[in-house]
Amino acid sequence: LVPMFLSKLICFITKKC
């Protein structure tokens, strides 16, 4: 499981939300 802040970081970097 990935922490929420990490998910948001991935979202920000990949621009896929």
Curated annotation (Swiss-Prot):
Its main location: secreted. It is found in: Secreted. Disulfide bonds join C11-C17. Expressed by the skin glands. Keywords: Amphibian defense peptide, Antibiotic, Antimicrobial, Disulfide bond, Immunity, Innate immunity, Secreted. GO terms for biological process: defense response to bacterium; innate immune response. One of its GO terms (cellular component) is extracellular region. It comes from the Eukaryota. The keyword Nucleotide-binding does not apply. Transmembrane segments: none annotated. Belongs to the frog skin active peptide (FSAP) family. Brevinin subfamily. Antimicrobial peptide. This is Brevinin 1Tc. It comes from Rana temporaria.
